């Protein structure tokens, strides 16, 4: 088990933790559909990334009432 060699003061501990804060990513507007998306990620709404379709969107399937 790790044991500290010297006591770390509250000031030094807090100064070390000053860089640990999480920053929320700024959402960008999709160039294809205009929805907000995460930077450098595929758009969840249309499946485009860098002006090309990466994920093909499935069309909605209509079910007959008799089949259900």
From Swiss-Prot:
Keywords: Ribonucleoprotein, Ribosomal protein. InterPro entries: Ribosomal_bL32 (IPR002677), Ribosomal_bL32_bact (IPR044957), Ribosomal_zn-bd (IPR011332). Belongs to the bacterial ribosomal protein bL32 family. One of its GO terms (cellular component) is large ribosomal subunit. It comes from the Bacteria. One of its GO terms (biological process) is translation. This is Large ribosomal subunit protein bL32. GO terms for molecular function: structural constituent of ribosome. HAMAP family: Ribosomal_bL32 (MF_00340).
């Amino acid at each position: 088990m790790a044991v500290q060699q010297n006591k770390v003061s509250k000031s030094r501990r807090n100064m070390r933790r000053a860089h640990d804060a999480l920053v929320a990513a700024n959402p960008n507007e999709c160039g294809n559909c205009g929805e907000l998306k995460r930077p450098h990620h595929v758009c969840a709404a249309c499946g485009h990334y860098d002006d090309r379709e990466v994920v093909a969107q499935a069309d909605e399937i209509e079910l007959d009432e008799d089949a259900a």
